[in-house]
UniProtKB/Swiss-Prot annotation:
Domain of life: Bacteria
GO MF: ATP binding; ATP hydrolysis activity
Residues the record lists as binding ATP: 41-48
EC main group: translocase
Origin species: Haemophilus influenzae (strain ATCC 51907 / DSM 11121 / KW20 / Rd)
SMART domains recorded: AAA
Example GO BP: peptide transport
Database matches in PROSITE patterns: ABC_TRANSPORTER_1, ABC_TRANSPORTER_2
Gene3D superfamilies, alphabetized: P-loop containing nucleotide triphosphate hydrolases
Pfam families per record: ABC_tran, oligo_HPY
Catalysed conversion reaction: a [peptide](out) + ATP + H2O = a [peptide](in) + ADP + phosphate + H(+)
UniProt protein name: Oligopeptide transport ATP-binding protein OppD
Topological type in the membrane: Peripheral membrane protein
Length: 323
């Protein structure tokens, strides 16, 4: 079976007055229909730029290189006219901040209906009925009444539900969720994750979940890709990454998760800061922060397969971590 999305050798670069920044560096992954890929990493690791590259939404000074094949169609450098036919209808995106992503001058109903009228050619009455139905699907109370309200009349969690409803209106085959639970309290986060799982089962939608919240990843993702400085550090199933991480950065992320059952008096952290993408260290970008770094790390490692398809970008053998 061919994957729904096949990304190979993806690069994203930005020309700045200080030089060229490589935000995404040789990214490779596949995604099947109905499955969920979590992309995790610190701020600036290239997670969101990967999504923008797939959607054709890079800033004016950005350029993309490589291949991203969606259902047999190459997305990279696809003309806007063709991209517009794919966006929303086949690939949708939930943007990072629900508090600012909706038009404050338009009622919620108008914004939802516009999607269906533009992409599906629905008349006003049909678009209204379908929008109410989708608001019901995302567990919006009094959905019909909410259609006549403005964004400022909604809480953050309610706005996020509207964003999810809008993204799913056209029944896309791929949903890209960029930090969908940012700025939401933990109760609402749990509701949103439950909702996405239900919608995935109902519509067989594939999801790319971009987040720095490892709890979110554990709750919804089948596959996980750990990114650092634009590169893949490790890639595998959620079980492999959470229970058998094989890269020092992945191990550091897992160790930094606060434990309710532990007796630790101090939180574990990864020393140092993410690198400046204009002045990356020689070789492995994580080496200045890695307690296991050796002279060999001055040469950039290659992604290698370790265990049942698990990939790692490190010179050190997995045996060093007793795995």
């Amino acid at each position: 079976m061919n994957p729904l999305l096949d990304v190979k050798n993806l690069y994203v670069r930005f020309k700045t007055p200080d030089g060229v920044v490589t935000a995404v560096n040789d990214l490779n992954f596949t995604l099947n229909a109905g499955s969920t890929l979590g992309i995790v990493g610190e701020s600036g690791s290239g997670k969101s730029q990967t999504a923008f590259a797939l959607m054709g939404l890079l800033a004016a000074n950005g350029e993309v290189e490589g291949s991203a094949i969606f259902e047999g169609k190459e997305l990279v450098n696809l003309p806007n006219a063709e991209l517009n036919k794919i966006r929303a209808e086949q690939i949708s995106m939930i943007f990072q901040d629900p508090m600012t992503s909706l038009n404050p001058y338009m009622k919620i109903g108008e914004q939802l209906m516009e999607v269906l009228q533009l992409h599906k050619g629905y008349d006003k009455q049909t678009a209204f009925a379908e929008s109410v139905k989708m608001l019901d699907a995302v567990k919006m109370p009094e959905a019909k009444k909410r259609m006549g309200m403005y964004p400022h009349e909604f809480s953050g969690g309610m706005r996020q539900r509207v964003m999810i409803a809008m993204a799913l209106l056209c029944r896309p085959k791929l949903l890209i969720a960029d930090e969908p639970t940012t700025a939401l309290d933990v109760t609402v986060q749990a509701q949103i994750m439950t909702l996405l799982n239900e919608l995935k089962r109902e519509f067989n939608t594939a999801i790319i979940m971009i987040t720095h919240d490892l709890g979110v990843v554990a709750g919804i993702c089948d596959q996980v890709m750990v990114m650092y400085a634009g590169r893949t550090m490790e890639y595998g199933t959620a079980e492999q990454i959470f229970y058998h991480p094989t890269h020092p950065y992945s191990i550091g992320l897992m160790d930094a998760i606060p434990r309710l059952d532990g007796n630790e008096e101090h939180l574990v952290t990864i020393p140092g800061n993410p690198p400046n993408l204009l002045h990356l260290p020689k070789g492995c970008p994580f080496s200045p922060r890695c307690q296991f770094a050796t002279e060999q790390c001055q040469i950039a490692p290659k992604l290698t397969t370790f265990n049942h398809g698990q990939l790692r970008n490190c010179w050190l053998s997995a045996e060093k971590f007793n795995l």
